[in-house]
């Protein structure tokens, strides 16, 4: 699930060194390595380039994921970004959506319901939850986040959304890069102390650097297909020699 969230969130961030940095922050947060929400929010608030809405979405994701003290202040820059441009229509729709989301229990169910709403209504609904005016499960909140990112990526891509399958090249591209990073991580964990460990680390390292480079300079969405295939091929070859089954990484 977190891989999916990372994919969607990163698909709305313009390529550049900042995108690579945000990818790292998300990975750390999801892995439980970064637990200082105050510092994270302060860092996010001062980032250049990002639109207020993108900052709002990231702030919402960090707040959902990082455990924090109950009384921690909500941040104004996130609240302002998630107020649906102050449009009362967005607020009305957000309340309707919130009532539907309360009935959902799965990430995909929530995402599906949310996709039929406008970005403004989705942002307002996140605002409701962020301001503790309503509560949903984390999984449902992530569904809402991903639906919002898909709407934004779609409008960036100007493509027509199809509900059932992700056809947006930006999201597919980001997904391949996230998968490549995840696979690299898995290779390093498997490497252990065997004599092939150095080789596994090398392959994983190359993959990391490529993903980092692709995020930093930005590439055509089609170029990432090869990256993942190469990585999986290397992984398969390495696992064959190690006598390990490929099952886990399909």
Curated annotation (Swiss-Prot):
Protein location: Virion membrane; Host nucleus
InterPro entries: Flu_matrix_M1 (IPR036039), Flu_matrix_M1_C (IPR013188), Flu_matrix_M1_N (IPR001561), Flu_matrix_M1_N_sub1 (IPR015423), Flu_matrix_M1_N_sub2 (IPR015799)
Annotated spans, Membrane-binding: 1-162
Membrane topology: Multi-pass membrane protein
Annotated region described as RNP-binding, given as residue ranges: 163-250
GO cellular component: a single term: membrane
One Gene Ontology term of the molecular function aspect: RNA binding
UniProt motif Nuclear localization signal: location: 99-103
Entry keyword set: Host nucleus, Membrane, RNA-binding, Viral matrix protein, Virion
Highest taxon above the source species: Viruses
Primary localization class, coarse: virion
Job of this protein: Plays critical roles in virus replication, from virus entry and uncoating to assembly and budding of the virus particle. M1 binding to ribonucleocapsids (RNPs) in nucleus seems to inhibit viral transcription. Interaction of viral NEP with M1-RNP is thought to promote nuclear export of the complex, which is targeted to the virion assembly site at the apical plasma membrane in polarized epithelial cells. Interactions with NA and HA may bring M1, a non-raft-associated protein, into lipid rafts. Forms a continuous shell on the inner side of the lipid bilayer in virion, where it binds the RNP.
UniProt miscellaneous comment: Most abundant protein in virion. When expressed alone can form virus-like particles in transfected cells.
Recorded family membership: Belongs to the influenza viruses Matrix protein M1 family.
Self-association state and partner proteins as the record states: Homodimer and homomultimer. Interacts with NEP. Binds ribonucleocapsid by both interacting with genomic RNA and NP protein. May interact with HA and NA. Cannot bind NP without genomic RNA.
Protein name: Matrix protein 1
Protein source organism: Influenza A virus (strain A/Teal/China/2978.1/2002 H5N1 genotype W)
């Amino acid at each position: 699930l977190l891989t999916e969230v990372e994919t969607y969130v990163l698909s709305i961030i313009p390529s550049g060194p900042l995108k690579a940095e945000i990818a790292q922050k998300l990975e750390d947060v999801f892995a439980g390595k970064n637990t200082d929400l105050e510092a994270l929010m302060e860092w996010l608030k001062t980032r250049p380039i990002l639109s207020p809405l993108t900052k709002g979405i990231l702030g919402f994701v960090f707040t959902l994921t990082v455990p924090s003290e109950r009384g921690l202040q909500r941040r104004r820059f996130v609240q302002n970004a998630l107020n649906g441009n102050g449009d009362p229509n967005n607020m009305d729709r957000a309340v309707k959506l919130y009532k539907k989301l309360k009935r959902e229990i799965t990430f995909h169910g929530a995402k599906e319901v949310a996709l039929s709403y406008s970005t403004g209504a989705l942002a307002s609904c996140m605002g409701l939850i962020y301001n503790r005016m309503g509560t949903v499960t984390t999984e449902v909140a992530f569904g809402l986040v991903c639906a919002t990112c898909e709407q934004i990526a779609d409008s960036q891509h100007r493509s027509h959304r199809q509900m059932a399958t992700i056809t947006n090249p930006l999201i597919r591209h980001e997904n391949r890069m996230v998968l490549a990073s995840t696979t690299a991580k898995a290779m390093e964990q498997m490497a252990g102390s065997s004599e092939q460990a150095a080789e596994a680390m090398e392959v994983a390292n190359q993959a990391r650097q490529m993903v980092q480079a692709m995020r930093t300079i930005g590439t055509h969405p089609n170029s990432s297909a090869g990256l993942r295939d190469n990585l999986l091929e290397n992984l398969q070859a390495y696992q064959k020699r190690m006598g390990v089954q490929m099952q886990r990484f399909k």
